[in-house]
């Protein structure tokens, strides 16, 4: 389903099993990427899904005769971590990894992970593929078109508009999501 709430349109895929096909879905965007993928997630979702993602990322490019560079960064997913310090730390790590401007950032997690990663991806001028795992994050990523950060003065006061390259909402994740999210 296309979303047109921002100046650019982007696709939103909603179905079961998308995490297991994350590599394939991202590599299908291959019109401009350097086959570099940075996955930004939190420790809980890394433990739940990383092995499935790595298996898929290893399988598809090899079958297509492609090479792929894959990196993972773990960030904090609590609401207190949705700030400029987290974005700055993430940008420093992205620069240290030597990522090209053609890489794709995939963010796997709740709305905090998606907002911090989205803000950093926009600042770093790279493409973004949010993979939200909670219902609130799925709604925000699919319809929002901006990454929100908290300031000392209040919650969600800093916004960075963006149009992701693709949003992947794997409904299978909702069964692993805490009820309060």
Regions found by a protein language model. Give the residues of each.
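Alpha-helix N-cap/helix-start capping motif
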Residues: 16, 43-44, 111, 133, ...
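Alpha-helical elements of the RecA-like P-loop NTPase motor core of helicases
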Residues: 48-51, 115, 137
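Glycine-rich nucleotide phosphate-binding loop and flanking beta-alpha elements
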Residues: 46-47, 112-114, 175
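A glycine/threonine-rich phosphate-anchoring loop and its flanking beta-alpha core
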Residues: 118, 123-181
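ATP/NTP phosphate-donor binding region
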Residues: 1-103
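Glycine/serine-rich anion-binding loops at beta->alpha junctions
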Residues: 103-122
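Residue-level detector of flexible, active-site-proximal loop/helix-junction positions
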Residues: 77-79, 112, 135
């Amino acid at each position: 389903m296309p979303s047109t709430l921002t100046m650019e349109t982007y696709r939103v895929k909603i179905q079961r099993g998308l995490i297991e096909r994350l590599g394939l879905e991202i590599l299908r965007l291959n019109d401009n990427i350097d086959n570099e993928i940075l996955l930004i997630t939190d420790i809980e979702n890394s433990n739940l899904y990383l092995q499935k993602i790595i298996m898929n990322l290893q399988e598809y490019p090899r079958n297509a005769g492609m090479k792929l560079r894959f990196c993972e960064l773990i960030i904090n997913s609590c609401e207190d971590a949705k700030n400029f310090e987290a974005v700055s730390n993430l940008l420093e790590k992205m620069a240290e990894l030597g990522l090209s401007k053609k890489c794709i950032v995939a963010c796997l997690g709740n709305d905090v992970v998606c907002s911090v990663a989205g803000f950093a991806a926009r600042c770093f001028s790279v493409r973004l593929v949010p993979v939200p795992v909670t219902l609130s994050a799925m709604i925000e990523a699919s319809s929002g078109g901006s990454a929100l950060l908290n300031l000392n003065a209040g919650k969600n006061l800093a916004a960075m508009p963006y149009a992701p390259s693709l949003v992947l909402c794997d409904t299978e994740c909702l069964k692993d999501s805490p009820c309060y999210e």
